[in-house]
């Protein structure tokens, strides 16, 4: 073939186009195979019962299907022909693409044979690689086609529908059907077709021999050669890493294995005639049990080769070689690759450390980075495909690696390092190209003995392009593009590799060497990202998800590997490289796989990290709990009740000495590892993983690992705080607020101390968690401590206070439990004193306290509703009493007619107890708010001072609402006003409601004397209150009155004066009562009048003096005091 025709044949261009096209066709075949093997995605026609007979008929008669005379068999197809055409067109066209691809491949292979091209991976690398890639791709397409079980049905059904619709078969069907039949036994047919190409294929493969042997060395040989080491020879550290064929140094061993196995499988004739071919083939058979066709589709090397060769004459020795190689691979390959992975972990870690410390070395030693990536990728992919396919083995440990995460992490680290310092790489290689490569190339071109015009033009353009480079292009961040130069070199390789070329590349190896060097240097300027994909793409995991997940789970169980777990979500970013433009329908599925697994891995990592954090928090809380004041009681007791030295030296058996706080830090030996040590170690490793990268992209989605950790920590902290409260709905047990607060502070202080290590916003986590705890439900709909404490105080403490088991002691500023038969499950004073109320306010915050108030007010309003009913029942009598309260004779007849007076007092007392508790909670809130926000508390108090009785009521309530939110007490309770306003009146007018409110005060006033009959109505000086909580009546009377008359826009003071007058008259009339039972605690009840005045901002002692003489109060105090001290004297002193 003439040189002119060699130029016109465009071998380089055709190889480039056909290889890309072949990958697309291969992926389409894979997609059809995958789709048809899954009943969920299979074409619906293949699953319909009515189609079964049609499908059997088409499969049996294929490709000679008589559509016109087979209506009884193809009736269902005829009915749905349009739908079948619409649905199966893509499938059919994909098979047609295979046929057309086959035609073009054979045309090109025959042309290359005719040109008698010379292939040598060390010289014409691109030409040889493209040639071998095309053969492997074509073989993979045919093998995958033969693995599609429904191929005949898909093609035959489409053609039947096409003929029914258009009256004739599809033009491609006859050839397509014949091709499908021919490749029912694909390898047999392929070996026949490739017989004429044996010389070219074997020549290309033999050029791999030296390279494959060198790249297939064991870990010991690598170690001896100090492979990938930059520090083994310090003087040569900055020398550029060069090779005669740079691309061969990072060429994948997996790719070479695929070339050799499939090449010799198709062109097996040379194995019997050429000992070098035989050696290379046997060496390759000893390396792997499986090679990849595409994604997870593999070729079982030894079985397939043995089956083929067994059917051929004269191949008995080769079959024996296969069996021997298989046994060697099973016995040794697992350990061989295991040792290489161990070596790479050490060597690449050293390389990454040096390059990270001195990134300038990435200039001269960039090749080392890509070699490291390629070596790691080869070992990982070998492990993955063998783990997936070798199911029965005596040595399963050969196909499992608990330390694989470290290799994956190092791969990601090298990739990140190259990306981060790409400018360093560009600056170095630009200078190399412009100041060295171009000079060497010029010398070589000038020394060529023969240089045809076409080749001369191409090489002159190389010199021109390289001479124009300057450093400003890198500084100005110009985009480089040397794709034209590389394609020209590919063309030049093709031109100089044909047999009749005037300029032969194999006769001018120096030209090949310098051009291969130039190609690598040009890639360092414009194709670094492509190089990273070529050498380190691990998108294979997208199709080995079970193995991927298993590796991740194994890594989580290995404490020393935890820091490398971030590599797994980072590798999900590789999945985007699986996409091919000829199969766009795959994109959503690949995207879902990538995002789902990335999300799953990060969720598991965040979950494990948050679990570890919360476990340490729990330990810190336990240590903090040991320092609580309650635990020093035993120490104080022992110190107080010291006995003899002997007794102290010999403590009783069964009474172990309690460890003092801090004892956990004492160690006799540092090798003793505590649970806390293990947790801290695990947390350190996990924190390194979660904080390794700020963000990364997966299929155009930006992923922030810290956000996963933040959300998990927030949720776990929420649950932990609720768990700390220790609420038991059955026994109504709960932790004291002060103890819960101490525990929460221990949790928070530890989490905040981790802020710089976790990479998460600790302040935001804590803030959000605590804020959610101030709401009734958290973000996941679970109960919070606000709900738990609100329910507990209402259902336990206040309910028992209403029944008289618990008493409010103003002297102690707490509720206290009264001694009763049977043990109480809690002590009221431990949950309601000043410190506890302050702690409660600290935990619940203003929002939580508002929720508590709203619940308290609901209970108050429910009592008010009942009180209104009682007033309405006694309306007529109360109206008369209100008019005639100063007439003793008439009152004596009216009072007995009242019903439910005791009920009124009881319900009003309950309201008073609730409001008293709320007041205590508000005081706690005020103290906390003042401590946290003094700059806010000042203006709020100042604003409250500006409110006068003349201020508009809406403005007043708004200001009071603000003040109440900060815990400041107000003359009128806005929460109570709002709660009463929300009560639904039974079609009653405001005037009637107002009348009921007035009569309620009258009812209370005339009912007060009834309290004197209750033995519990004795005023206790010690408690500064009554054992039946009637001192809470005063708060109820004042606050309910203020709320009611504010609501009805009436004068509060006037109505409270009326109450004072009526109550005074009622109590004064009690003084004339002769029945001792009715006057039993008259003096104690009289004191209520003073308590009412003290409680109210609207009443004064002068007002009280005008209707109830102060002398009576003074006498009452004296009598109550005398009776109290008499009761405390021992019985013998009476």
From Swiss-Prot:
Write down the superkingdom of origin.
Eukaryota
The residue ranges crossing the membrane are: 999-1019
Membrane topology note = Single-pass membrane protein
Per UniProt, the keywords (alphabetical) are: Cytoplasm, Membrane, Transmembrane, Transmembrane helix
Q: Where in the cell is it found?
A: Membrane; Cytoplasm
Report residue spans for region: Disordered: 638-671
Any single biological process term in GO: positive regulation of T cell proliferation
Specify where it is mainly localized: membrane
GO annotations of cellular component type: cytosol; plasma membrane; SCAR complex
Task: Write out the biased-composition intervals (Basic and acidic residues).
Answer: 652-666
Q: Output the Pfam families linked to this UniProt entry.
A: Nckap1
PANTHER family recorded for this chain? NCK-ASSOCIATED PROTEIN 1, NCK-ASSOCIATED PROTEIN 1-LIKE
Its function? Essential hematopoietic-specific regulator of the actin cytoskeleton. Controls lymphocyte development, activation, proliferation and homeostasis, erythrocyte membrane stability, as well as phagocytosis and migration by neutrophils and macrophages. Component of the WAVE2 complex which signals downstream of RAC to stimulate F-actin polymerization. Required for stabilization and/or translation of the WAVE2 complex proteins in hematopoietic cells. Within the WAVE2 complex, enables the cortical actin network to restrain excessive degranulation and granule release by T-cells.
User: What binding partners and quaternary form does the record give?
Assistant: In hematopoietic cells, component of the WAVE2 complex composed of ABI1, CYFIP1/SRA1, NCKAP1L/HEM1 and WASF2/WAVE2. Interacts with ARHGAP4, PIK3C3/VPS34 and PPP1R12A/MYPT1. Interacts with mammalian target of rapamycin complex 2 (mTORC2) components, including MTOR and RICTOR.
The protein here is known as: Nck-associated protein 1-like
Q: Which gene encodes it?
A: Nckap1l
């Amino acid at each position: 073939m003439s040189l002119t025709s060699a130029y016109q044949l465009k071998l380089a261009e055709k190889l480039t186009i056909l290889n890309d096209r072949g990958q697309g066709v291969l992926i389409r075949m894979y997609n059809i195979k995958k789709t048809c093997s899954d009943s969920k995605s299979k074409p619906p026609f293949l699953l319909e019962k009515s189609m079964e007979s049609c499908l059997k008929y088409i499969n049996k008669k294929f490709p000679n299907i008589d559509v016109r005379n087979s209506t009884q068999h193809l009736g269902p197809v005829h009915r749905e022909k349009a739908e079948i055409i619409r649905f199966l067109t893509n499938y059919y066209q994909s098979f047609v693409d295979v046929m057309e691809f086959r035609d073009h491949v054979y045309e090109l292979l025959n042309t290359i044979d005719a040109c008698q091209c010379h292939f040598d991976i060390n010289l014409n690398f691109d030409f040889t690689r493209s040639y071998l890639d095309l053969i492997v791709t074509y073989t993979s397409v045919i093998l995958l086609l033969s693995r599609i079980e429904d191929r005949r049905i898909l093609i035959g059904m489409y053609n039947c529908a096409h003929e029914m619709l258009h009256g004739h078969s599809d033009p491609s069907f006859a050839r397509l059907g014949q091709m499908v039949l021919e490749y029912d036994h694909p390898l047999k047919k392929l070996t026949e077709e490739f017989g004429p190409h044996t010389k070219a294929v074997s020549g290309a493969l033999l050029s791999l021999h030296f390279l494959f042997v060198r790249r297939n060395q064991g870990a010991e040989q690598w170690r001896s050669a100090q492979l990938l080491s930059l520090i083994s020879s310090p003087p040569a550290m900055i020398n550029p890493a060069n090779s005669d064929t740079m691309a061969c140094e990072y060429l994948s061993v997996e790719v070479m294995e695929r070339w050799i196995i499939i090449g010799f499988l198709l062109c097996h004739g040379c194995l019997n005639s050429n000992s070098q071919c035989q050696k290379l083939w046997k060496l390759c058979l000893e390396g792997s049990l499986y090679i990849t066709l595409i994604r997870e589709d593999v070729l079982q090397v030894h079985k397939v080769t043995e089956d083929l060769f067994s059917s051929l004459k004269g191949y008995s020795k080769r079959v024996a070689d296969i069996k021997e190689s298989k046994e060697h691979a099973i016995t040794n390959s697992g350990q061989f690759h295991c040792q290489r992975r161990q070596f790479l972990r050490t060597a690449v870690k050293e390389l990454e450390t040096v390059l990270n410390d001195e990134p300038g070395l990435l200039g001269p030693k960039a090749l080392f980075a890509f070699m490291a990536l390629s070596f790691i990728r080869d070992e990982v992919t070998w492990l993955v495909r063998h783990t997936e396919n070798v199911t029965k083995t005596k040595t399963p440990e050969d196909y499992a690696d608990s330390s694989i995460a470290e290799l994956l992490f190092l791969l990601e680290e090298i990739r990140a390092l190259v990306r981060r310092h790409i400018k360093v790489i560009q600056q170095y290689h630009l200078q190399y190209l412009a100041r060295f490569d171009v000079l060497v190339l010029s010398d070589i071109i000038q020394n060529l003995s023969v240089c045809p015009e076409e080749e001369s033009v191409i090489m002159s353009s190389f010199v021109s392009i390289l001479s124009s480079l300057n450093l400003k292009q890198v500084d100005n961040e110009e985009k480089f593009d040397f794709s034209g130069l590389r394609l020209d070199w590919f063309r030049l390789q093709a031109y100089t590799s044909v047999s009749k070329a005037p300029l032969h590349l194999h006769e001018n190896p120096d030209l090949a060497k310098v051009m291969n060097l130039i190609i690598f240097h040009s890639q360092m300027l414009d194709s670094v990202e492509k190089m990273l994909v070529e050498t380190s793409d691990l998108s294979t995991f997208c199709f080995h998800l079970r193995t991927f997940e298993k590796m991740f789970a194994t890594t989580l169980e290995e404490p020393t590997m935890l820091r490398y777990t971030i590599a797994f979500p980072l590798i999900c970013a590789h999945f985007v490289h699986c996409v091919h433009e000829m199969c766009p329908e795959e994109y959503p599925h690949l995207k879902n796989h990538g995002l789902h697994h990335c999300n799953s891995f990060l969720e598991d990592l965040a979950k494990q990290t948050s679990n570890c954090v919360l476990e340490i928090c729990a330990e810190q809380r336990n240590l903090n709990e040991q320092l609580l004041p309650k635990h020093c009681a035993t120490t104080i007791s022992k110190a107080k009740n010291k006995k003899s030295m002997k007794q102290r030296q010999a403590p009783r058996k069964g009474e172990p000495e309690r460890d003092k706080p801090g004892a956990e830090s004492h160690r006799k030996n540092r090798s003793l590892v505590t649970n806390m040590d293990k947790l801290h170690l695990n947390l350190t490793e996990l924190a390194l993983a979660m904080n390794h990268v700020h963000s990364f992209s997966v299929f155009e989605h930006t992923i922030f690992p810290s956000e996963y950790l933040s959300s998990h920590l927030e949720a776990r902290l929420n649950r932990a705080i609720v768990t700390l409260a220790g609420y038991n709905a059955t026994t109504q047990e709960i932790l004291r607020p002060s103890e819960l607060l101490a525990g929460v502070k221990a949790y928070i202080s530890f989490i905040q101390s981790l802020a710089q290590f976790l990479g998460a916003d600790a302040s935001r986590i804590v803030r959000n968690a605590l804020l959610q705890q101030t709401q009734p439900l958290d973000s996941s709909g679970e109960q919070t401590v606000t709900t738990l404490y609100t329910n507990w105080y209402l259902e336990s403490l206040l309910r028992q206070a209403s029944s008289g088991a618990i008493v409010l002691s103003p002297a102690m500023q707490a509720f206290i439990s009264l001694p009763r038969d049977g043990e109480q499950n809690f002590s009221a004073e431990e949950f309601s004193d000043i410190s506890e109320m302050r702690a409660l306010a600290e935990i619940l915050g203003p929002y939580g306290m508002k929720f508590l108030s709203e619940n308290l007010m609901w209970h108050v309003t429910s009592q008010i509703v009942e009180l209104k009913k009682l007033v309405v029942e006694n309306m007529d009598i109360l109206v008369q009493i209100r008019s005639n309260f100063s007439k003793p004779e008439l009152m004596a007849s009216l009072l007995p007619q009242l019903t439910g007076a005791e009920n009124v007092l009881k319900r009003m007392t309950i309201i008073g107890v609730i409001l008293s508790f709320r007041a205590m909670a508000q005081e706690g809130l005020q103290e906390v708010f003042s401590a946290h926000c003094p700059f806010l508390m000042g203006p709020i108090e100042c604003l409250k001072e500006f409110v006068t009785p003349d201020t508009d009521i809406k403005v007043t309530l708004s200001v009071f609402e603000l003040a109440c939110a900060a815990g400041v007490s107000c003359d009128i309770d806005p929460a109570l006003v709002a709660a009463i306003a929300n009560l639904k009146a039974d079609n009653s007018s405001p005037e009637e409601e107002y009348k009921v409110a007035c009569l309620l005060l009258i009812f209370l006033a005339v009912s007060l004397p009834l309290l004197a009959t209750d033995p519990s109505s004795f005023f206790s000086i010690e408690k500064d209150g009554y054992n039946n909580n009637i001192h809470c009546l005063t708060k109820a009377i004042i606050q309910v009155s203020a709320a009611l008359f504010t609501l009805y826009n009436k004068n509060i003071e006037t109505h409270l004066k009326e109450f004072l007058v009526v109550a005074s008259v009622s109590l004064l009339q009690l003084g004339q009562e002769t029945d001792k039972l009715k006057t039993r605690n008259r003096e104690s009840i009289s004191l209520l009048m003073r308590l009412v005045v003290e409680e109210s901002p609207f009443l004064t002692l002068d007002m009280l003096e005008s209707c109830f003489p102060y002398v009576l109060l003074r006498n009452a105090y004296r009598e109550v005091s005398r009776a109290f001290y008499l009761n405390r004297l021992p019985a013998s002193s009476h």
